[in-house]
């Protein structure tokens, strides 16, 4: 068997085992050194794949796909700086425990650190952000094929195990590496002949949910039963079963629940949005739970964590599915690594439901706060960043998805969304490292993984940051509606103290831009609109939801007016809360 045959077979075996293990979606970027892997993936009858001229965009697309499916997409790239472009997406995936697999083709060992063209030190490039790094040997009949297959088995296991995240496999190839059908009767294949004749992986890892032990459940039930005023927080929950179980627990025991936007429960109409209550500084002073039970990951807003820090409750319990460290305030008294759904189900019936008087604020407060927000959404009023969030939240359904960019879009949706859903639905956001890079690519991957229409809300700077990702949309096969909140710059900085530094604020922080969103959409063949009123905006959103094509809706705003609207509305809600708390 010659080198071309060995290399072709080597690559086909890698791709075959990945497909058998359920990692059958490939994000491929063109390149010469990765030819064997690309051809093997493209020709596999059960593999799905998409091409990405930009590896950075590919990395974020794979991240979004993982968020939607909890399965790793496989990234394939050539040698050199190509793999380095995955770095931002790898950081986000690692920080937020999202599975990802990277196959980077490389030059052979003898060319490393010799000045050879397109050759860098690729192995270990992601440092501590990778769950496992491995360098396969150059394809050779001296290498047992079973060792190659089991390396792939371990890679998938590491990416999807108890602490999911990115895994990097470096795959060096010597020339020539053009594909050539190998001799399948070669003696080199004898040790894997049974594997070839089946469709099952050589070695499967049977991972199981982190099951709570009896002692954990017993301790938790006792703590909650003896608590005078328990309080629940739902942080980031990665699947619908966790969201359903946590929501059911709060409802059955009538325990007040702070549902973060990333929990999937923020838009559940059976829970009042406590984000509004936390706008009043008096609220955490008057409402003092003795037990806080936090399910899942971190929160979008700072106020709840600040309140817990001030409360210093006797019991501060965190239930999280992974072994990553969590708790920047260092005030957790009990940390349990287990499935949030299993814990929540095991706590049902642990005490009699709390009386209605134990809720943080009475129902009329939330109704009046809702009325204040809804004034911003009157049909003939100009569409604003607040009304856009409110309207989008009222239109999304469990049959669709929602993705939020960092900076103001995620904060506005968390605070001003309208609870209108009857059950949890998928909400995506990159809150591991909270960057604004790669948002369109991530949302596109999220839509691909969900196989459902998705609405993305994004600011103009984040939109421009990932502009080339618009090239992915015409062939996405799933409608993605991008709502661009265009306030001519970085709107969030207008809320920060640096806004008073007049000599540097506009040029160094707000960074105003004058690019045409419409022209960008036209360049990539995407329909766009710019509604002026809330009525027009809602009509555009409904039209986008009924379409099978991707679209862009531009909400043109003014940063100064936006700050004024936010502060006016916030002061009204704060005053409203204070009036109820003083009674």
UniProtKB/Swiss-Prot annotation:
EC number: 2.2.1.9
Gene3D superfamilies named among the record's database cross-references: 3.40.50.970, TPP-binding domain
Domain of life according to the entry: Bacteria
Protein's name according to its UniProt entry: 2-succinyl-5-enolpyruvyl-6-hydroxy-3-cyclohexene-1-carboxylate synthase
Gene name of this polypeptide: menD
Manner of cofactor binding, per the entry note: Binds 1 thiamine pyrophosphate per subunit.
Coiled-coil portions: none
Catalytic reaction annotation: isochorismate + 2-oxoglutarate + H(+) = 5-enolpyruvoyl-6-hydroxy-2-succinyl-cyclohex-3-ene-1-carboxylate + CO2
UniProt source species: Chlorobium limicola (strain DSM 245 / NBRC 103803 / 6330)
Pathway in which this enzyme or protein is active: Quinol/quinone metabolism; 1,4-dihydroxy-2-naphthoate biosynthesis; 1,4-dihydroxy-2-naphthoate from chorismate: step 2/7; Quinol/quinone metabolism; menaquinone biosynthesis
SUPFAM superfamilies listed in its UniProt record: DHS-like NAD/FAD-binding domain, Thiamin diphosphate-binding fold (THDP-binding)
């Amino acid at each position: 068997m010659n080198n071309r045959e060995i290399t072709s077979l080597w690559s086909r075996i890698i791709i075959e085992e990945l497909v058998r293990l359920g990692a059958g979606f490939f994000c491929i970027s063109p390149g010469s050194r990765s030819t064997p892997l690309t051809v093997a993936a493209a020709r596999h009858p059960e593999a799905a794949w998409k091409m990405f001229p930009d590896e950075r965009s590919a990395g974020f697309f794979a991240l979004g796909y993982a968020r939607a499916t909890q399965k790793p997409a496989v990234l394939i790239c050539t040698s050199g700086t190509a793999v380095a472009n995955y770095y931002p997406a790898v950081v986000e995936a690692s920080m937020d425990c999202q599975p990802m697999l990277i196959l980077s083709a490389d030059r052979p060992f003898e060319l490393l650190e010799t000045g050879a063209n397109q050759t860098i030190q690729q192995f270990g490039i992601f440092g501590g952000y990778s769950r496992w790094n491995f360098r396969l040997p150059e394809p050779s009949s001296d290498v047992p094929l079973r060792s190659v297959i089991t390396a792939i088995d371990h890679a998938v296991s590491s990416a999807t195990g108890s602490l999911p995240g990115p895994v990097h496999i470096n795959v060096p190839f010597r020339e020539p590496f053009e594909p050539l059908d190998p001799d399948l009767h070669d003696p080199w294949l004898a040790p894997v002949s049974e594997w070839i004749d089946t469709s099952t992986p050589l070695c499967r890892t049977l991972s199981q949910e982190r099951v709570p032990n009896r002692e954990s459940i017993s301790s938790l039930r006792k703590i909650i039963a003896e608590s005078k005023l328990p309080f629940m927080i739902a942080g980031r929950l990665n699947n619908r079963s966790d969201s359903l179980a946590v929501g059911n627990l709060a409802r059955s025991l009538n325990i007040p629940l702070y549902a973060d936007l990333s929990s999937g429960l923020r838009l559940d109409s059976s829970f009042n949005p406590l984000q509004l209550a936390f706008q009043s500084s008096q609220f955490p002073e008057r409402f003092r739970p003795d037990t806080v039970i936090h399910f899942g990951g971190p929160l979008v807003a700072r106020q709840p964590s600040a309140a817990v820090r001030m409360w210093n409750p006797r019991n501060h319990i965190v239930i999280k599915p992974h072994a990553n460290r969590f708790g920047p305030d260092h005030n957790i008294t009990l940390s349990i690594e287990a499935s949030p759904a299993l814990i929540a189900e095991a706590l049902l019936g642990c005490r009699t439901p709390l009386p209605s008087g134990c809720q943080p604020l009475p129902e009329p407060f939330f109704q009046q706060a809702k009325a204040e927000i809804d004034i911003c959404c009157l049909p003939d009023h100009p569409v604003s960043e607040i009304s856009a969030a409110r309207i989008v939240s009222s239109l999304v359904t469990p049959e669709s998805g929602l993705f939020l960019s960092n900076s103001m879009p995620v904060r506005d949706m968390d605070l001003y969304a309208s609870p209108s859903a009857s059950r949890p639905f998928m909400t995506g956001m990159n809150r591991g490292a909270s960057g604004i890079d790669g948002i369109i690519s991530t949302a596109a991957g999220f839509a691909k993984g969900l196989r459902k229409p998705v609405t993305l809300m994004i600011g103009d700077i984040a939109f421009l940051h990932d502009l080339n990702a618009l090239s992915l949309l015409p062939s996405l096969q799933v409608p993605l509606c991008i709502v661009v909140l265009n306030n001519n710059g970085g709107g969030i900085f207008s809320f920060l103290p640096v806004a008073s530094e007049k000599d540097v604020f506009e040029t160094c922080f707000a960074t105003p831009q004058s690019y045409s969103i419409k022209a960008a959409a036209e360049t990539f063949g995407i329909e766009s609109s710019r509604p002026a009123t809330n009525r027009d905006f809602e009509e555009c959103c409904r039209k986008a939801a009924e379409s099978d094509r991707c679209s862009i809706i531009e909400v043109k705003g003014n940063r100064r007016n936006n700050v004024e609207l936010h502060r006016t509305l916030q002061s009204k809600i704060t005053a409203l809360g204070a009036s109820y708390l003083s009674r």
